[in-house]
Swiss-Prot record:
Tissue expr: Particularly high levels in spinal cord, cerebellum, metencephalon, superior and inferior colliculus, diencephalon, olfactory bulb and eye.
Keyword Amino-acid biosynthesis in annotation: no
Protein known as: Semaphorin-6A
Glycosylation sites: N33, N49, N65, N282, N434, N461
A GO BP entry: axon guidance
Topology versus the membrane: Single-pass type I membrane protein
Modification type Phosphoserine: residues: S698, S953
Taxonomic source organism: Mus musculus
Sema domain location: 24-512
Alphabetized InterPro entries for the sequence: Plexin_repeat (IPR002165), Semap_dom (IPR001627), Semap_dom_sf (IPR036352), Semaphorin (IPR027231), WD40/YVTN_repeat-like_dom_sf (IPR015943)
GO molecular-function terms, A-Z: identical protein binding; semaphorin receptor binding; transmembrane signaling receptor activity
Amino acid sequence: MRPAALLLCLTLLHCAGAGFPEDSEPISISHGNYTKQYPVFVGHKPGRNTTQRHRLDIQMIMIMNRTLYVAARDHIYTVDIDTSHTEEIYCSKKLTWKSRQADVDTCRMKGKHKDECHNFIKVLLKKNDDTLFVCGTNAFNPSCRNYRVDTLETFGDEFSGMARCPYDAKHANIALFADGKLYSATVTDFLAIDAVIYRSLGDSPTLRTVKHDSKWLKEPYFVQAVDYGDYIYFFFREIAVEYNTMGKVVFPRVAQVCKNDMGGSQRVLEKQWTSFLKARLNCSVPGDSHFYFNILQAVTDVIRINGRDVVLATFSTPYNSIPGSAVCAYDMLDIANVFTGRFKEQKSPDSTWTPVPDERVPKPRPGCCAGSSSLEKYATSNEFPDDTLNFIKTHPLMDEAVPSIINRPWFLRTMVRYRLTKIAVDNAAGPYQNHTVVFLGSEKGIILKFLARIGSSGFLNGSLFLEEMNVYNPEKCSYDGVEDKRIMGMQLDRASGSLYVAFSTCVIKVPLGRCERHGKCKKTCIASRDPYCGWVRESGSCAHLSPLSRLTFEQDIERGNTDGLGDCHNSFVALNGHASSLYPSTTTSDSASRDGYESRGGMLDWNDLLEAPGSTDPLGAVSSHNHQDKKGVIRESYLKSNDQLVPVTLLAIAVILAFVMGAVFSGIIVYCVCDHRRKDVAVVQRKEKELTHSRRGSMSSVTKLSGLFGDTQSKDPKPEAILTPLMHNGKLATPSNTAKMLIKADQHHLDLTALPTPESTPTLQQKRKPNRGSREWERNQNIINACTKDMPPMGSPVIPTDLPLRASPSHIPSVVVLPITQQGYQHEYVDQPKMSEVVAQMALEDQAATLEYKTIKEHLSSKSPNHGVNLVENLDSLPPKVPQREASLGPPGTSLSQTGLSKRLEMQHSSSYGLEYKRSYPTNSLTRSHQTTTLKRNNTNSSNSSHLSRNQSFGRGDNPPPAPQRVDSIQVHSSQPSGQAVTVSRQPSLNAYNSLTRSGLKRTPSLKPDVPPKPSFAPLSTSMKPNDACT
């Protein structure tokens, strides 16, 4: 089954490949190293310095009266064509026509470059035997003149060249003199918007196409105009109006106008063509879906081939498509028959174009010339009825396309990187003038030479690719290092056997045949099948055959049969000091190439070299260097150049290998990328897992262990003894599990630099409902602070004794005591006391605080009975401005009750007893530590405890907050009617881990940010009896 499927695929591929014709190979190839010996014209006169050159900008060339006219920028050169092929070409005369300075200034004012503001000769025609008609752009102000042919002197007045010559040299134009009238096609405005087919001069009225009507002309590019019969035919390409829905589709067209057209009536088509019709040219490869060549490049004049009048045209693919060119032949009778067929119309702007029925076509038929045999009663076109004129105005397009001869291209060239743009035809080639040879010029400076074959039907049936020539001479034609290889025009002179090829910077004279290359080798001369070459018996060499030559010669154009002819060994002929030979008998010794050479009559084919084993690469043997064989004879290689094709098999193998290697490399790259991503994902997952485990044991707050509940000394201190988090896994510690949570720091070896700071602690909304035990402690502490008189020195190691610290389930101590060097600890920390000792110490402190409170009360009562009232009044008149902080002890999303925080109500005062308040912001924690430690050690049960002071939290600045602060207050009611409420503040502490070894007292890290909130005074919520105040 598989072999059958493979055979079917091969058959389909063969059929598909046979659908499109393959390019033929030339019999002979002439490279630039050989053609550089041809004469070149660069604008010099005989005897002038050839090193100095000026830019020519050649626009066109024309042969008239055995003289070659070269139309360039600001000049027209004349060259004598009756010279040999070995002589240099010089101009015999030079006509200079430069633009006036006023026109140049106007051109520059219009925004054009100075190189564009010249007079480019675009129209050069023979008006009659004595007059030369010339038109130029004249710095974007086209003008025309008449010159005498013999002297090139101007005569008559200069007149406007509008509608006869374009404004810009880049715009295409055509012009033709017929019966003394000038038929031109170009643009009529500066912006090249209005395209026109125009008739002027002569005794007939001036006519033009309808202005700005896309049905008549839509962005045309004019190529050629020919005079045939009663009509003038214009060949051009334009945007197809019938295919507007498909975008800008370009079609080749041919249009006709009658020579005797006098225009329409005063009502319809006045001073406009009444015979203008246009049709599409069809040049396509037939098949189920035709492959069209729509870009018309060049058209010949009407030539007669085998008794028929035809025109040959070159077409190409669009410039944004794959390169390809074709040559199609059209019979003039077929063109005339299309204009007698059906018309095409569009009934509405959105509808498609459809044929017009014959019954709707008015009489007389539009497009016919007045005064013809079918329209004898209409002497001129002015007499046509309005129906005919209106119909021709709205229906200029024909429905059918002009078919090419044999309904397919006569020649194809698709496997090259250039397009064919020019054409020249010799329809009387050979000594008997019975052959047709076509020369095609490309945009790369390459000339292709073909022989038209006549089939059994008596007409063109194909072509024979005779020769390929690279005629551009970079040494002489390049200007300022720029090589412009576009061929601007070609003119063939059969009498001199020359083809003049014009580039923008030079003109090269190329012989029609290279017969001297064959020398004395008869086999190669016959095998070349060139109508211009033949084997001359008298001289025993291959020579050029002029028309009607009387020399005895041998040719075989049809078959090129070389049977019975001997091989050509070491035969060469010298030309201009260079020896040449087509057959490399001594330089290529392989048998394969030799057999191929002999089978074609001595013509070398590069396929033989490719198939020959052990042969050298022909692509590398294209250099222009001559080489010398063993016998001293200089040979030259004429193999294909680097821009030729490679074998299909090699190309297929290269494509397959490239595909396989690309697939392998792509797989490797994809595997590496996937593996790298997989590793990255694994690393990220492992890091997230480790981070999750580390977060489970993260600390919400860390505090020092030593000196927490009373005893600041330890018998056996150990370093780095600190408390573990008081909040474990987001829950507050309770008395039942407090002992479990207090762990030695030496078991963890925590890094002190990693301890949390107030800035890095997330904030949560704090609940406002306080705990009852914490509220009582705050109230008692507030009373003690309010009743103090003096403050101890800043450096005193006395610490105030708080009211009894209650071990409530939600209570967190606000201060911890750390060992200091002044007490002899030598930077060591004490062990954590046991839970029972902590409870006992708390009880002792409670009793001491109660006794101290009673002592202060009695002391105040003995001094002033109304002291408490005054104190309350002072307190109410000047409440302390202490900021309220809000913080959290857990992760984001959780909230803690206010009772779970360590709170303290502080009152700040001055040395005057309870009358003024002053905020105190210690500059560092060491000062506060010394002060509080000393107060606690020395003044626990004495009356001096009235001087106890509550300082601000650690880590604050030296200055108080500038904005008013909100305070949490309680009310103190007096027994007097005028008693005032005392508002006291509760201030949390902020602690920074700056220097643990130097501080004797360390507060727990504050859980509230240091930002000044808005001021707020809470209402009185807790009442105190009068006897609770200081009396």
